[in-house]
Amino acid sequence: MDPQDCKCETGASCSCGTTCSCSNCKCTSCKKSCCSCCPAECSKCSQGCHCEKGSKKCSCCN
């Protein structure tokens, strides 16, 4: 599934199947990471990794 812009407010949940607290979250196929810096192909992103502001990859994928 391609990333989708859920247009959710910061701190709000979005309709990606799991709770998302990112503004304009990008939902990936695993539906466990909503941040755009967590690519769908990174399996570690479903393990509670976080995204640094301005980063292209989540903390687990660096």
Curated annotation (Swiss-Prot):
Q: Which superkingdom?
A: Eukaryota
Q: Where does a divalent metal cation 6 bind?
A: C38, C42, C45, C61
* Keywords, comma-separated and alphabetical: Acetylation, Metal-binding, Metal-thiolate cluster
Q: Where are the N-acetylmethionine residues found in this chain? A: M1
GO terms, biological process: cellular response to cadmium ion; cellular response to copper ion; cellular response to zinc ion; detoxification of copper ion; intracellular zinc ion homeostasis
Q: Where is this region: Beta?
A: 1-30
Role of this protein: Metallothioneins have a high content of cysteine residues that bind various heavy metals.
- Hey, which family's this protein in? Belongs to the metallothionein superfamily. Type 1 family.
Write down what this protein is called.
Metallothionein
Native source species: Xenopus laevis
Which gene does this sequence derive from?
mt-a
